Curated annotation (Swiss-Prot):
Species lineage: Bacteria, Pseudomonadati, Pseudomonadota, Betaproteobacteria, Burkholderiales
Enzyme class: isomerase
Main location: cytoplasm
GO aspect biological process, one term: glycolytic process
The encoding gene: pgi
Pathway assignment: Carbohydrate biosynthesis; gluconeogenesis; Carbohydrate degradation; glycolysis; D-glyceraldehyde 3-phosphate and glycerone phosphate from D-glucose: step 2/4
Descriptive protein name: Glucose-6-phosphate isomerase
One Gene Ontology MF term: carbohydrate derivative binding
Recorded GO CC terms: cytosol
Family the entry assigns: Belongs to the GPI family.
Length: 540
């Protein structure tokens, strides 16, 4: 199946040509925006969240055509296959059952395994939080260091930061991912070897960055007085390869299992989220799962016309494949969601940054947009200038939490006002005539610089309060959005072959950096020159 061969495609193309020059300002004009208002028609709810799509460049006819696209592309069949545990990751011959990790039904796949592992996690988390689990000298654990990269880092880090307000104040959680030693070194400056627990997270337990950091941390413990025989008090492992965990030196009792039917970027709901559970406790971790389950149920049962992940995915396709948008911005107006954009970068681009269709043919249409972002209001003072007045179209997801999770409540109206005002300004813009009035007769040359084209599309997601449950729903919303887009593009969102070639060549280059001699013909001239400069700096 090719996207542009679907029966609805010519109708979508014709519709795009029809409305491409229409301005949102006109659609919101009082004469045109009668009851039910545009905001009422294009605001939908699900899983405890609300999404206002009204400031997007679409009409009722657009949504109808996009929903038809979803049906013709088999979105419903792909969704149902994923939930049923079918092989939806054909290149690796695997299911993608992250939803089973939060299911609460006895007939859901792998429930006995999931329940047993979560119970083990809960016992361990309770022991650490209560002080029953101590370091080798009997000190309570005051620091947890999560060592992992990609999905073993981004998800847990994002959630622990987001739920800081409900986390225990007795334990600080640190995350180390980069093989750059500075990442680990800065954490080592802040922790006590007698009161630190390390969680090493790697699906294979062979990941270069993770194992390099894990070995350095183990050496640091020993160098700072921890007997090698007591390291079991300070190290646990999370992996789908328990034998490698034990081989590293972690006690078998300290191994938590993940499975090959859960992809790394979808794995925070599993034992990969052990650092989350220690931070917020097992009960709140269950609430996080419940929120994701709320969105799972909405995704499975809501009509496509009112289905938040479906609509969010289709709106993204509208801009990517018709308007030619190269990127889209995620702007959470919540400092607690500081790491959400970087988490979504991996979720979206590693999942859907593909050029090969499921059938092995190459696509002849764009797939994943570049995903980027920064919390508001910081972004307003960095890159919003380009969003308002630059020539590039960048669709935006605003995320607003309506009630604060902190005691400084007087700040919150200012935060929300900025979020809503930005969406209004991006939609309305400022005409040249309006700019001339502001510039005045004394400075007419200033008017062009005061114009804003407007018509910049935004979606605003509303969360009543940031809780484990609403956060779980928000994360699952984006997970399912990715699946919707993958189904339409006919690609596999659950593999990541694009990371492999660099890893293979990286091992060759690393060997050349320390080898006695290097064959300059082994690499291209640029790479050879880079290696030569590095060897000189390293004293080789």
């Amino acid at each position: 199946m090719t996207l542009n061969s679907l029966p609805v495609w010519p109708a979508l193309q014709a519709h795009y040509e029809e409305i491409r020059d229409a301005h949102l300002r006109d659609w919101f004009a009082p004469a045109n925006d009668r009851a039910p208002t545009r905001a009422e028609r294009f605001t939908f709810e699900g899983g405890g969240l609300a999404a206002d799509f009204s400031k997007n460049r679409l009409t009722d006819a657009t949504l109808a055509l996009l929903v038809r696209l979803a049906r013709e592309a088999g979105v419903e069949a792909r969704r149902d296959a994923m939930f049923a545990g079918e092989t939806v990751n054909p290149t690796e011959g695997r299911a993608a059952l992250h939803t089973a990790l939060r299911a609460n039904a006895p007939d859901a796949p792998f429930q006995a395994q999931v329940a047993a592992e979560r119970a083990k996690m809960a016992r361990f988390a309770d022991a650490v939080r209560s002080g029953a689990w101590t370091g080798y000298t009997g000190k309570r654990i005051r620091h947890v260091v999560n060592i992992g990269i990609g999905g073993s880092d981004l998800g847990p880090k994002m959630v622990v930061h987001a739920l800081h307000h409900v986390a225990t104040p007795d334990i600080a959680t640190h995350f180390v991912s980069n093989v750059d030693g500075a990442d680990l070194a800065r954490v080592l400056e802040r922790i006590d070897p007698e009161a630190t627990l390390a969680i090493i997270v790697s699906k294979t337990f062979t990941t270069l960055e993770t194992m390099t950091n894990a070995r350095s941390l183990r050496d640091w413990f020993v160098a700072n007085g921890c007997p090698e025989g007591a390291l079991a008090k300070h190290f646990v492992g999370v992996s789908a390869n328990p034998a490698e965990v034990v081989k590293f030196g972690i006690a078998e009792a300290n191994v938590f299992e993940m499975w090959d039917w859960v992809g790394g970027r979808y794995s925070l709901w599993s034992a990969v989220g052990l650092s989350i559970m220690i931070a917020i406790g097992p009960e709140r971790f269950d609430e996080l799962l419940a929120g994701a389950r709320d969105m799972d149920e909405h995704f499975r049962t809501a009509p496509l016309e009112r289905n938040l992940p479906v609509l969010q995915g289709l709106v993204g396709i509208w801009y990517r494949n018709f308007f030619g948008a190269q990127s889209y911005l995620v702007a959470p107006y919540s400092e607690a969601l500081h790491y959400l954009p970087s988490y979504l970068q991996q979720l979206e681009m590693e999942s859907n940054g593909k050029s090969a269709r499921i059938d092995g043919a190459f696509v002849d249409y764009p797939t994943s947009a570049v995903t980027w972002g920064e919390p508001g209001t910081n972004g307003q003072h960095a890159f919003f200038q380009m969003l308002h007045q630059g020539p590039t179209l960048v669709p935006i997801d605003f995320i607003a939490v309506l009630t604060p999770e902190h005691p400084l409540a007087s700040h919150h109206p200012k935060l929300l006002a900025n979020c809503f005002a930005q969406s209004e300004a991006l939609m309305l813009g400022r005409t040249l005539d309006e700019a001339r009035k502001i510039a005045g007769p004394a400075k007419p040359e200033l008017a062009p610089h005061l114009t804003f084209p407007g018509n910049r599309p935004t979606t605003t997601l509303l969360v009543d309060a940031l809780t484990p449950r609403t956060l779980g729903a928000l994360i699952a919303l984006y997970e399912h959005k990715v699946l919707v887009q993958a189904a339409v593009w006919n690609i596999n969102p659950f593999d990541q072959w694009g990371v492999e070639l660099g890893k293979i060549l990286g091992k060759v280059v690393e060997a050349d950096l320390t080898a006695a001699q290097v064959d300059p013909a082994k690499h291209d001239s640029s790479t050879s020159a880079l290696i030569a400069r590095a060897r000189k700096a390293l004293g080789e």
